[in-house]
C-alpha cells in the first residue's frame, strides 16, 4: 500500500506548480472577462440613462411649450378683454378699527389661596383658517437651461425692502411707459409684459416671497416697492407691473382707474380696517392698498375680468419674515416670582417696521402662528429652557406665565397708540407697554414651542386669555372641555395667578374659543 501512495504524492507534488500557474491564468482571464462585462454593463446603463434623460428633456420641453402656449392664450384673452369699457364703480368708505369698551385692568392676585376649580362654558369655537398658497399661472422654472445664464450682479437691479437687499432681473429692455391709461393702451402694454422677457423677473419674485417668508401681504407690499424702484414711485407703470406679477403669481387682483391714475385692488379672506374698498361682481370686497390712492374721487372704472384658478390673498403669516438686521439696544425682561428667569432681548427694527405696516386683523391665531424671530429665540429660549429643565409641564407653564405676567408693563392700546393694535410676538419686546391680547399671544407662542402643548385663545368681552391642554398630566383649576380634551385656564394678565385661575369677573362668562392649529 505504501508503495502506491508515495508515488502518487510525488506526482502531485511535481505537477502542482503547473496546476497553480494554470489556475492563476484562469483567475486572470475571469477577472478580465468580468471587467469587460462590467464596462459593457456600465456603457449600457449610461446609454439607458442618456436615453431616459433625452426623453425627459423632450417631455419637459413639450410641457414647457404647453405651459407657455397656455399662458400666452390666457394673457392674450385677458388683454383683449381689457380693451372693453371698464365698469363704473363707487368706492366704499374704509371701516375704522372698532373701538373696544373699557377693558379690564390687570387683576393682581395677592394671596396663594386657590379658587374652586369648575368646568366653564363657552359660546362657540372659531377654527383656524386653512389656506393654500396661490400657484403661479405657469411654472417658469420648469425648463432648466443647459448652461447657467451669466449674471453680473453689479449691473443687476437691486432694491431694498425693509432694510433687506433684494435682487431681481429687470433690465433696460424691460422698461415701458404708459402715455395714457385708456383701455386700449393698458391692453397693449399688458401684451408686452406677457412676453418671455419677464419670465426671469417672475421667477425672482416667486423666490423672494419664499426666501424672505413674506406671506401674502408682505409679497404684495414687496412687489409695490420693487415696481416703484424700477418704474417710479406712485407711477401707473409701477401699478401695472405689480398687478401683472400678482396675477401671474395666482392672486385674485383687479385694476381700477380714477382720472389718469391706475389703482390696484386686492381682496382678502378677512375684512381689513382703515382701507376703502369696492364690492365687485363676485360679491367680494376689493381694497385700495395704496395709501396715496385712497384719497381719490369716489367714482372709478374697474376692469373686473378674472384669471383662471386665482386665489384670494390671506393675512395668515407662514412664519416670521427673514429681513435684514437693524439691531436696537437690548432690554432686560425678568420674572417677578422666579428671579432667575430673565433674558436680555434685542429686537430687529426692520421687522418691527414691517409689522407696523401690517393691517390690523381680528384673527389672533395668525399672530400666534407667526411666532418669534430667530434673533429673539436665540437669546430668550435658552434662558427659559434653563429654568424649566427637569420641571413638570405644569411647573414649567407656571414659570412661563409668571414671566409674561410680570416682565412687561401694562397699558391699553388706546392710551399707548390712540387706536387698537394687536402685537406680533416680537413687538411685545419692542414697545414699552402691552395689553391682554399681546400677552396672550406671547404666552401661547412660548407654551406651544417650549412645552409642545396645545393652546387655545379665550375671547371674552373686552378681554383675551388662554387655556392649555396638559395631556395626561392632572392639573387643578378651572377648565373647558373642547373636542373631548381638557384645557385649563391660563391668564397672562391676571398678575401673579397660577395656571388654572380665572379672573373673578370672567368666571361666569362664556368665552369664544379660538383654535390656533
Summary of predicted features, one role per range:
Residues 20-98, 103-109:
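N-terminal propeptides/low-complexity segments immediately following signal peptides
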Residues 225, 237, 241-385:
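Extended, non-transmembrane interaction/recognition domains
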Residues 46, 57-60, 83-245:
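Long, contiguous, compositionally biased segments that the model treats as domain-scale units
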Residues 36, 69, 73, 240, ...:
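Extracytoplasmic/secreted proteins, especially bacterial periplasmic and envelope-associated proteins
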Residues 172, 182-223, 364-430, 493:
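Secondary-structure boundary elements
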Residues 1-21:
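Classical Sec-dependent N-terminal signal peptides that target proteins to the secretory pathway
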Amino acid at each position: 500500500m505504501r508503495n502506491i501512495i508515495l508515488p502518487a504524492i510525488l506526482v502531485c507534488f511535481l505537477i502542482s506548480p503547473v496546476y497553480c500557474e494554470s489556475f492563476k491564468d484562469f483567475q486572470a482571464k475571469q477577472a478580465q472577462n468580468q471587467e469587460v462585462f462590467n464596462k459593457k454593463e456600465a456603457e449600457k446603463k449610461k446609454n439607458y440613462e442618456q436615453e431616459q434623460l433625452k426623453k425627459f428633456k423632450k417631455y419637459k420641453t413639450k410641457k414647457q411649450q404647453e405651459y407657455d402656449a397656455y399662458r400666452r392664450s390666457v394673457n392674450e384673452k385677458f388683454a383683449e378683454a381689457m380693451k372693453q369699457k371698464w365698469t363704473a364703480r363707487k368706492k366704499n368708505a374704509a371701516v375704522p378699527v372698532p373701538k373696544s369698551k373699557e377693558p379690564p385692568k390687570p387683576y393682581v392676585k395677592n394671596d396663594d389661596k386657590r379658587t374652586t376649580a369648575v368646568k366653564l362654558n363657552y359660546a362657540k369655537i372659531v377654527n383656524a383658517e386653512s389656506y393654500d398658497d396661490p400657484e403661479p399661472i405657469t411654472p417658469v422654472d420648469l425648463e432648466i437651461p443647459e448652461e447657467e445664464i451669466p449674471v453680473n450682479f453689479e449691473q443687476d437691479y437691486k432694491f431694498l425692502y425693509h432694510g433687506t437687499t433684494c435682487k431681481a432681473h429687470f433690465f433696460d429692455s424691460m422698461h415701458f411707459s404708459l402715455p395714457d391709461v385708456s383701455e386700449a393702451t393698458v391692453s397693449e402694454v399688458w401684451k408686452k409684459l406677457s412676453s418671455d422677457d419677464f419670465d426671469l423677473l417672475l421667477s425672482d419674485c416667486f423666490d423672494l416671497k419664499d426666501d424672505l417668508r413674506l406671506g401674502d401681504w408682505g409679497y404684495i407690499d414687496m412687489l409695490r416697492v420693487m415696481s416703484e424702484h424700477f418704474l417710479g414711485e406712485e407711477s401707473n407703470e409701477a401699478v401695472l407691473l405689480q398687478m401683472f406679477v400678482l396675477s401671474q403669481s395666482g392672486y385674485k387682483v383687479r385694476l381700477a382707474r380714477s382720472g389718469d391714475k391706475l389703482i390696484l385692488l386686492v381682496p382678502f379672506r378677512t375684512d381689513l380696517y382703515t382701507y376703502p374698498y369696492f364690492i365687485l361682481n363676485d360679491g367680494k370686497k376689493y381694497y385700495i392698498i395704496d395709501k396715496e390712492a385712497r384719497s381719490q374721487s369716489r367714482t372709478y372704472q374697474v376692469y373686473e375680468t378674472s384669471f383662471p384658478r386665482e386665489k384670494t390673498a390671506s393675512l395668515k403669516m407662514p412664519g416670521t419674515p427673514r429681513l435684514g438686521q437693524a439691531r436696537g439696544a437690548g432690554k432686560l425682561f425678568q420674572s417677578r416670582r422666579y428671579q432667575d428667569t430673565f433674558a436680555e432681548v434685542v429686537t430687529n427694527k426692520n421687522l418691527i417696521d414691517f409689522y407696523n405696516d401690517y393691517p390690523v386683523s381680528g384673527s389672533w391665531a395668525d399672530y400666534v402662528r407667526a411666532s418669534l424671530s430667530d434673533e429673539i429665540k436665540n437669546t430668550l429660549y435658552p434662558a427659559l429652557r434653563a429654568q424649566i429643565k427637569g420641571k413638570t409641564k405644569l411647573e414649567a407653564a407656571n414659570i412661563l406665565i409668571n414671566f409674561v405676567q410680570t416682565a412687561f408693563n401694562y397699558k391699553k392700546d388706546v392710551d399707548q397708540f390712540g387706536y387698537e393694535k394687536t402685537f406680533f410676538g416680537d413687538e411685545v419686546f419692542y414697545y414699552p407697554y402691552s395689553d391682554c391680547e399681546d400677552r396672550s399671544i406671547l404666552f401661547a407662542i412660548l407654551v406651544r414651542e417650549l412645552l409642545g402643548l396645545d393652546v387655545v385663545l379665550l375671547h371674552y368681552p373686552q378681554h383675551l386669555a388662554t387655556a392649555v391642554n396638559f395631556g395626561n398630566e392632572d392639573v387643578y383649576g378651572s377648565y373647558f372641555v373642547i373636542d373631548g380634551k381638557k384645557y385649563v385656564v391660563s391668564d397672562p394678565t391676571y398678575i401673579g395667578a397660577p395656571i388654572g385661575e380665572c379672573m373673578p369677573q370672567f368666571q361666569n362668562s362664556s368665552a369664544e374659543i379660538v383654535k390656533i392649529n
